[in-house]
C-alpha cells in the first residue's frame, strides 16, 4: 500500500467538516498549566457540545442557535479519494464547531490551519502550504488509524486565532502579542497526528524548544453515534453536578 504523501496530509486536514456528524472523545494537554484537566466531550454538529471531566463532573453545556447551512452554500471540491482538495468560501457556509474555552478547541476538531496558508484564516490559498511536512507515516492512535508527520510552520501559516494556534510560531506570537507572551525558545518542529476517519487533529507534540513535549492528545471514543437532545441540557440549579446526565 502506498504511504500517504504531504498533499494527502493537507487534504485530510481540510476535510473534517464533511467526515462526521457526532463525536465523543477525551482530550488532555501536556506542558500547559492553564489546561491541566483531562476532559470528555460529546459534540453534535452543528451546534451542541457537552464537556465533563473524565471523572464525570459536568463543566459546560453549549447550545448555540446556529442556522442550518443554506442549501445554496457551495460544497467542497473533492479528490477522487473523497478528501477535500479545496474548501468552499462563502458567507452561506459556517462549519465551526461549538467552542470550549478557546479557539484551540475549534482548530483541533477542524485543523484546516495545518493545510493551507494565506492572508487570513478565511482567505486561504491551496498553493501556499501552511506547513513543511516530513514523511507521513500511518500509525495507530487510541485504536484508530491516524497519519503522523513531523512538521514545521512556513511563513504562510495562519491559525484560526493567533492567541491559541495549534502550533506555536514566533511570527504569529509577535503579531498577536508584540513582545509579550513569547517562548524562551521555540520548538524545532512538531509531531502531528490526524485521525484518518474524521480528519480531527488528535495529537500535537513540540519537538525541542523550551517546552518539549507540550501539546495535546485526543482519543476518539465514538463517531456518528446518535446523541439525544437530553444530553445537551444543563441540570437545574442546585442539582448535584458530578456525573449528572439526563440519559443515564
What positions do the PLM features span?
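Non-transmembrane domains of secretory- and envelope-associated proteins
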Residues: 129-132, 141-144, 155, 169-190, ...
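Short, hydrophobic/aromatic-rich segments at coil-to-beta transitions
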Residues: 19-26, 47-50, 142-150, 200-203
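Short, surface-exposed charged micro-motifs
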Residues: 39-41, 50, 60, 189-193
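Exposed beta-strand-loop-beta-strand "reactive/processing" segments of non-cytosolic proteins
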Residues: 37-42, 147-150, 155
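N-terminal leader/targeting segments and the immediate start of mature chains
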Residues: 1-47, 74-108, 126-140, 176-180, ...
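Short, surface-exposed beta-strand-loop junctions and turns on beta-sheet-rich folds
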Residues: 57-60, 67, 155-156, 209-211
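Short hydrophobic/aromatic-rich beta-strand segments that constitute the beta-sheet cores
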Residues: 49-53, 68-73, 201-206
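Generic short beta-strand segments
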Residues: 26-31, 150-159, 207
Amino acid at each position: 500500500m502506498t504511504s500517504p504523501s504531504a498533499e494527502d496530509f493537507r487534504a485530510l486536514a481540510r476535510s473534517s467538516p464533511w467526515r462526521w456528524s457526532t463525536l465523543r472523545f477525551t482530550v488532555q494537554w501536556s506542558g500547559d498549566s492553564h489546561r491541566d484537566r483531562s476532559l470528555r466531550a460529546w459534540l453534535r454538529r452543528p451546534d451542541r457540545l457537552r464537556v465533563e471531566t473524565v471523572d464525570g463532573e459536568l463543566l459546560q453545556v453549549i447550545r448555540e442557535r446556529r442556522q442550518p447551512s443554506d442549501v445554496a452554500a457551495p460544497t467542497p471540491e473533492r479528490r477522487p479519494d473523497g478528501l477535500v482538495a479545496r474548501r468552499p468560501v462563502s458567507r452561506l457556509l459556517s462549519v465551526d464547531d461549538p467552542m470550549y474555552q478557546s479557539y484551540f478547541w475549534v482548530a483541533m476538531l477542524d485543523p484546516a490551519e495545518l493545510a493551507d496558508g494565506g492572508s487570513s484564516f478565511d482567505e486561504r490559498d491551496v498553493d501556499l502550504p501552511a506547513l513543511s511536512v516530513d514523511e507521513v507515516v500511518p500509525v495507530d492512535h487510541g485504536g484508530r488509524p491516524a497519519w503522523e508527520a513531523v512538521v514545521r510552520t512556513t511563513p504562510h501559516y495562519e491559525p484560526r486565532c493567533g492567541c491559541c494556534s495549534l502550533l506555536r510560531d514566533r511570527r504569529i506570537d509577535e503579531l498577536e502579542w508584540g513582545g509579550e507572551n513569547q517562548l524562551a525558545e521555540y520548538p524545532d518542529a512538531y509531531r502531528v497526528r490526524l485521525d484518518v476517519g474524521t480528519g480531527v487533529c488528535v495529537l500535537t507534540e513540540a519537538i525541542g524548544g523550551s517546552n518539549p513535549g507540550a501539546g495535546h492528545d485526543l482519543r476518539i471514543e465514538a463517531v456518528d453515534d446518535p446523541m439525544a437532545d437530553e444530553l445537551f441540557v444543563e441540570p437545574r440549579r442546585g442539582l448535584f453536578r458530578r456525573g449528572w446526565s439526563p440519559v443515564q
